[in-house]
Amino acid sequence: MLFRSPIAPAFLLVGLFGLSTILWGTLTCTWFGLSPQQLPQWLQALSIPVISNVYADTLWVLPWTPAGVGLTTAQNLQIFCFTLALIQLTVAHIKGALRNRKSLKMLGDIGSILQLLGIYYIVLSLVVNAQVFSFGLVISGIPVGTVAIALIGIGFVMSFVFANYEGSVIKSILSSLVNIVSVLLGVVNVFSDIVSYIRLWAVGLAGAAISATVNELASPMLGNFMFMIFAIVLLVFGHGLNMILNVLSVIVHGIRLNTLEFSSHLDMSWSGHKFEPFKE
């Protein structure tokens, strides 16, 4: 056997983070805060153009947009984060629908999925680019903006009628009416839950900024032999600290997105343990 004893979960987690970081750095061509011009051509070629740092200044024009209107690489990364939100939250409601498949309550979960799809487009329009994802957008004769709003409306009605179903549609509607404020705020919460995933982009942006700052501080000292040792120490300390902060941020934000956004859409609550100080 390669390992005589099982690997500690912490090491497996750190290893997974490390491999994921290397993969993401390869796809986006971000290596220790270095500019693409400082990297070899073969490393640049491994990246995906639409999210690559190599094409940071490129304007990506879509088939339905006029000349001069398009998406930047940063906006493409934001779309990636919001798409990840759509996928994960949709999975939560699919699990809920399967759990309630023998009840009409399943229609409430389907309605929530429709709301997610519609609000996803609203987020792209309001947060990413209103010109590319306009409410008046028509693609192949399909009014995308109108369809998005219709999905939100249909999904809201389905959730309003069936979300509290326990054997009676009338009682389910009355329950929704009693909690009408919470029901209406639920639509806003869906919007905020999707937007919340932009924290993933922000964390990556902060890490890249720290790396670039460390490089700028150390680069003037690399040309002087007397200060080279200090430059090496600064680079090791700065990038090492950045890695530690990134590990913590990934754990913190990952836990939040799973225990709050994902769990709330899964209709799962965390009970925890009662805090009893001074008790052994």
Model-predicted segments: where are they?
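Conserved, carboxylate-rich catalytic/transport cores that coordinate ions
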Residues: 1-280
